[in-house]
C-alpha cells in the first residue's frame, strides 16, 4: 500500500529486503503492522524534513483508515506512537501502528504482487482472542502448559 500510494520506493526493480528501500521513500513498513516515517536525521536515506513529519504521518494514517477490500474496512484503528508508547525509547517506536480488522493480516512484505493476496503462512496473531487469568494461588506456568490448560478447561465446561 505504501508503495502504491507513492510513500515507498525501492532502489531496484525486484526488491528482496528492506535494505532495498530507495531514495525518495517517505515511509516504510515492517512486520507486524509498523510504519516508520523516513526522517532525514533519523535514517540513512531519510527524505522527510521534521517540519513535514506530522503532515506525512496524518496522510498515511487517514489513507490506511480508508483502506477497503471488497467493501470491507481493512483497518480497525491506526495508532500514533505517542498513543501506545512512552518513556526514554519513544523515538525508536514505530510512528504508526495499524490494527487490522479480523480476517486481515498486515505485513511489511517487500516481495508482494499487490496489497491483497495470500502467502504460504496461514494464521495470524490477534490481540483479543484468548485470555488467561492467573492468581497468587496458581502454580507457575510456562507456554508449554497452554494446551493442557485449554483442553482441561473445555472438558470441565462440557460436564
State what each model feature region is:
Residues 1-104:
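Secreted, luminal/periplasmic, and some membrane-associated catalytic domains
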Residues 3-4, 54-57, 115-120, 150-151:
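Short, low-complexity, polar/charged sequence segments that are solvent-exposed and flexible
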Residues 97-147:
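Low-complexity, glycine/alanine/valine/leucine- and proline-rich hydrophobic stretches
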Residues 48-71, 126-159:
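C-terminal accessory region downstream of the catalytic core in glycan-modifying enzymes
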Amino acid at each position: 500500500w505504501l508503495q502504491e500510494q507513492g510513500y515507498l520506493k525501492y532502489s531496484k526493480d525486484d526488491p528482496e529486503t528492506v535494505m532495498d528501500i530507495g531514495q525518495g521513500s517517505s515511509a516504510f513498513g515492517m512486520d507486524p503492522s509498523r510504519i516508520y516515517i523516513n526522517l532525514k536525521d533519523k535514517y540513512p536515506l531519510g527524505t522527510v524534513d521534521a517540519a513535514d513529519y506530522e503532515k506525512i504521518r496524518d496522510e498515511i494514517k487517514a489513507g490506511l483508515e480508508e483502506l477497503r477490500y471488497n467493501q470491507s474496512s481493512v483497518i480497525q484503528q491506526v495508532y500514533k506512537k505517542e498513543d501506545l508508547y512512552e518513556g526514554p525509547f519513544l523515538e525508536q517506536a514505530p510512528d504508526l501502528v495499524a490494527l487490522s480488522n479480523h480476517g486481515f493480516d498486515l505485513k511489511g512484505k517487500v516481495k508482494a504482487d499487490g496489497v491483497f493476496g495470500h502467502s504460504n503462512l496461514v494464521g495470524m496473531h490477534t490481540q483479543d482472542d484468548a485470555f488467561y487469568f492467573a492468581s497468587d494461588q496458581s502454580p507457575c506456568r510456562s507456554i508449554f502448559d497452554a494446551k493442557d490448560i485449554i483442553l482441561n478447561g473445555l472438558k470441565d465446561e462440557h460436564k
